UniProtKB/Swiss-Prot annotation:
Taxonomic source organism: Paraburkholderia phymatum (strain DSM 17167 / CIP 108236 / LMG 21445 / STM815) (Burkholderia phymatum)
Protein keywords: Allosteric enzyme, Cytoplasm, Hydrolase, Metal-binding, Protease, Sodium, Threonine protease
A GO cellular component entry from the record: proteasome core complex
Subcellular localization: Cytoplasm
Positions annotated as active site in the UniProt record: 7
Subunit structure, interactors included: A double ring-shaped homohexamer of HslV is capped on each side by a ring-shaped HslU homohexamer. The assembly of the HslU/HslV complex is dependent on binding of ATP.
Reaction(s) catalysed (UniProt annotation): ATP-dependent cleavage of peptide bonds with broad specificity
Transmembrane regions: none
Protein's name according to its UniProt entry: ATP-dependent protease subunit HslV
Length: 178
């Protein structure tokens, strides 16, 4: 059976502001199944942003588990991410899930990979998904050479990724914490 896949999620942190955005395309094989999916959300009393890429059902399963870990650890993003990663590595069912998450709060941005790794991105910029490399390169160039806000950088990076990646569209959802 073919998998749902393809998306672009990008996060930019600059000073005390962070933005996290994603496109809206859901693809099954070579068919666009949905163009307006919401892959970026606010959770934990709107204090944490999360974006997901990969298999849609897998991503929702991980999102639910991550939200439970945040509740258990009173919103401590790093602790919740590490605990989710531990479960992801040891639980036989979770190990089969094919998804990645970017999470951000007022002070921290983390990438949680399908291997159960928790990564703190260099320079406050990270991206995942099929268009992630395009978006990350664009975000880095914009951050290094302009005074744009994190939201503006995320928006422009997603636009560039949407122009280059066939699994990424121009329907964007962007959330910020300031």
């Amino acid at each position: 059976m073919e998998q749902f896949h393809g998306t672009t999620i990008v996060s930019v942190r600059r000073g005390d502001k962070v933005a996290l955005g994603g496109d809206g395309q859901v693809t099954l094989g070579n068919i666009v199944m949905k163009g307006g999916a919401k892959k970026v959300r606010r959770i934990y009393n709107n204090k944490v942003l999360v974006g997901f890429a990969g298999g849609t059902a897998d991503a929702f399963s991980l999102l639910d588990r991550f939200e439970a870990k945040l509740e258990k650890h009173q919103g401590n993003l790093t602790r919740a991410a590490v605990e989710l990663a531990k479960d992801w590595r040891t639980d036989r069912m979770l190990r089969r899930l094919e998804a990645m998450l970017i999470t951000a709060d007022a002070t921290t941005t983390l990438v949680i990979t399908g291997n159960g790794d928790v990564l703190d991105p260099e320079g406050g910029i990270c991206a995942i998904g099929s268009g992630g490399a395009y978006a990350q390169a664009a975000a880095k160039a914009l951050a290094d050479n302009t005074d744009l806000s994190p939201r503006e950088i995320v928006e422009k990076s997603l636009e560039i990724a949407g122009d280059m990646c066939i699994y990424t569209n121009h329907n964007r959802v962007i959330e910020t914490i300031e």
